[in-house]
């Protein structure tokens, strides 16, 4: 039987994991600085994003925003106090609303940051995004590499609006080069608000914890009617089939969800079907 841990222990373990990831990022950045010769592009290493601020080299902080947010230890820096943090959160909402207010119809594309350009799903994401752009529909992603880069690339090459909603993480790269409208966030919940507020549909490609987190949050918002008509597409039947089997099996059999909840998403391998369903929330308005 698994040993139960307290909330305090869980917070400490999470904070430690964040700090370990940050240390790994810093060691990689600093080691990349060594051996740089005159004339190299830059000796400062990979940029670190903190909201709208870009930091490199020695200016990269040793503690992350997330680590401070979940810490129970009282902070000595007034910038870490809850009232100041509240203002910072408000400013992120204002920046996001201001940047996206006139975006127009849009579809969000989610997926793994680890997908390589040689992966077939990368090409699928590129093509679907390009086809959306050709319909004058903006494409919104998390702004990172992998599937996100592929979708931004497809939209940009088609001459469309390619949006990247990036997040401050100590172990991920900066916004990909195919974003033509980018916003940097510190807080996941602000970023997620922008996804659901400005998208009329969502397409989920294969991904890990981050993609699953985003997918289930959108499903819950649709299930509880917190958002309106939000068509949800899972692209890649081979990848999603076991998850769908679990949802239609134990979840439904044990009355954890309703029959109607199964209809909240569609699984497909077809570009045309994915686009038709994802944009049905736009065409029905």
What are the language-model segments listed below?
Residues 1-9:
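Short Lys/Arg-rich cationic patches that frequently serve as NLS/NoLS or arginine-rich RNA/DNA-binding motifs
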Residues 10-165:
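Glycine-rich beta-alpha loop segments
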Residues 100-102, 131-133, 155-156, 173-177, ...:
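Solvent-exposed alpha-helices and their adjacent loops that cap or buttress functional pockets
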Residues 114, 169, 239:
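Short, glycine/serine-rich, charged loops/turns that create anion-binding
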Residues 146-205:
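Acidic/glycine-enriched connector segments
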Residues 174-177, 212, 222-230, 237-245, ...:
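Glycine-rich phosphate/nucleotide-binding loop
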Residues 186-238, 280-285:
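Active-site/ligand-binding-proximal alpha/beta "capping" segment
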Residues 234-285:
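C-terminal functional extensions of proteins
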